[in-house]
């Protein structure tokens, strides 16, 4: 999602609050909870899940392994839910022609670098760069080459842009910033 006028362009970045992350976190939570319940029911000898009797799974070694997988899955699921709630990777890109400034903001993990805020002048932007890697998993990433700071990614590596979409986005941004486009 973006908002643009003659002088200002604001591009909102989604971050980790994507539908696929919600689905994976939910599926992983339910699966690991099921593994933990099966392992626990084999330990106490009572049916906590009525799908099959607990006598079919003995605690040593199957119950221990299922409990371990359940606990490990709950840890991974809680990590996913934390990244979703913190919106890691979310933020915005703000290009202001009137003031001649570019501001890039992203949310990070809690701690010292929770708020990642980059600010620089538009005249320091050397080019907009498109990096294309073809193959089994094609990757197209848009970078902004800044003097003294190197290449700053503007799109995520997991966004699946078609060649036409990434070229269109790069052309619009390069036109707005009045800088050349490089393709690698």
UniProtKB/Swiss-Prot annotation:
Topology relative to the membrane, per the entry?
Multi-pass membrane protein
A GO CC term attached to the entry: photosystem I
Keywords recorded for this protein, A-Z: Chloroplast, Membrane, Photosynthesis, Plastid, Thylakoid, Transmembrane, Transmembrane helix
State which residue ranges cross the membrane: 24-44, 57-77
Mostly located where?
Answer: plastid
What functional role does this protein have?
Seems to be required for the assembly of the photosystem I complex.
Q: Which PANTHER family match?
A: PHOTOSYSTEM I ASSEMBLY PROTEIN YCF4, PTHR33288
Family of the protein in this entry = Belongs to the Ycf4 family.
The name under which this protein is listed is Photosystem I assembly protein Ycf4
Which organism is this protein's natural source? Buxus microphylla (Littleleaf boxwood)
Its encoding gene is what? ycf4
């Amino acid at each position: 999602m973006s908002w643009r006028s003659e002088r200002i362009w604001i591009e909102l970045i989604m971050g980790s609050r994507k539908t696929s992350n919600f689905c994976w976190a939910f599926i992983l939570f339910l699966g690991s909870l099921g593994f933990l319940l099966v392992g626990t029911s084999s330990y106490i000898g009572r049916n906590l899940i009525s799908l099959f009797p607990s006598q079919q799974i003995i605690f040593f070694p199957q119950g221990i392994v299922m409990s371990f997988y359940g606990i490990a899955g709950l840890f991974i699921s809680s990590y996913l839910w934390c990244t979703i709630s913190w919106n890691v990777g979310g933020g915005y890109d703000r290009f202001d022609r009137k003031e001649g400034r570019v501001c890039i903001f992203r949310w990070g993990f809690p701690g010292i670098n929770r708020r990642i805020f980059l600010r620089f002048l538009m005249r320091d932007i050397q080019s907009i760069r498109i990096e294309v890697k073809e193959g089994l998993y094609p990757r197209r990433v848009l970078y902004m080459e800044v003097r003294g700071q190197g290449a700053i990614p503007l799109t995520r590596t997991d966004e699946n842009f078609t060649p036409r979409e990434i070229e269109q986005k790069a052309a619009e941004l390069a036109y707005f910033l009045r800088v050349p486009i490089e393709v690698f």
